[in-house]
Every structure is written in structure tokens, then in C-alpha cells.
Amino acid sequence: METLTSSSQSLISSPMSKKDYSSEIICAFDIGAKNPARTVLEVKDNSVRVLDISKLDWSSDWERHIAKDLSQYEYTTVLLERQPRRSPYVKFIYFIKGFLYHTSAAKVICVSPVMSGNSYRDRKKRSVEAFLDWMDTFGLRDSVPDRRKLDDVADSFNLAMRYVLDKWNTNYTPYNRCKSRNYIKKM
């Protein structure tokens, strides 16, 4: 299902009550101006449910758009992809932290990107492959539109899933640090 709103394109969405204290709502943002992405997962009773995966648009009036995107759910944890010191996107991290400081009980955590390796292109390719594997696992592959630029939503989804798997002390091979050039061929 694809839902369109003025500031985001939702790839996968499902309704949820605003307050469910027995579950943990995890939100992960892949930061960027042109192609930011958000994934929202609900972890409840040792199961994971995908609530939302969205491509966002923060290219203009970014404060209003980010505030709107942050206000859609009541998160328990917000994961932000760590940015280099002089990155122009650091302002988004500070804005999100400041916005949630007094308005939410959510923990805000800056995390390193999930994939590591030799080249940017290889990391993005592995991220998309892992994302599509997870979509198969969740039975949501048909909901993912065919498009070339899936790496942003893949990165946000992988941030959230790595966080969940780390909490469960579960190892997932594609998320392991790998320096081999032939990693993709070995999968």
C-alpha cells in the first residue's frame, strides 16, 4: 500500500493506538535534506511489527516538516544516523533532540550506520539487499514500490532492526562489520 501526504510518501503504514504502554515504539531516521527516511517499528511480546516506512521531504520549511514527522507517533526510542562533524545535516539532529527534549519521554540515540565496508556503493547495495530480505520476512515485499532510490528507506529500516536485534542479543550476518570486497558475492 502506498499512501501519499504532502510531506512524505509512506511505503508501509498501519494504524496504531497512540498509547500502548506494553509495547516499545522505535523510530529510526536516515538523515538528509533531499532524501531523509523514517522507519517506525513496534516491539511487543518478542515480536516486531512494521508500523511505517516513509520517504520524507525536508528540503523546504524543514523545521515544520520534521516537527510534523516527529508528532505522528509516541516513540519510546528515536534513532538518528550519526553525521560527520561538519555535515550540514547535523542541524536536523540538534533540532530533533531539542524538539523531543520537553515534549516526549523518548530516548534519542545517535547511532553509526549499520553497513560498513570499502565503498559507499557497496554499503548501499548491501543495505538495500538486507532491507528487501526483511520485507520478504515480514511479508511486505509487494508493498515496496519498484524504484531505484531505496537506500534511504533501507538505511532507516536497518538502523531500527539492528537496534531491536541488539536488544535481543541476536546476531544477523548482514549487519556484522565486514571489510571484504567479495562480501556481496559470498551472500
Curated annotation (Swiss-Prot):
Keyword check for Thylakoid: no
Cofactor(s) the protein requires to work: Mg(2+)
EC number: 3.1.-.-
GO terms classed as biological process: DNA recombination; DNA repair
One CC-aspect GO term: membrane
Keyword Transit peptide set for record: no
UniProt cofactor note: Binds 1 Mg(2+) ion per subunit.
Primary site of residence: membrane
Keywords for this protein: DNA damage, DNA recombination, DNA repair, Hydrolase, Lipoprotein, Magnesium, Membrane, Nuclease, Palmitate
Family that this chain belongs to: Belongs to the RuvC family. Poxviruses-type subfamily.
Function field: Nuclease that specifically cleaves and resolves four-way DNA Holliday junctions into linear duplex products.
Protein name: Holliday junction resolvase
The species this protein was found in: Vaccinia virus (strain Ankara)
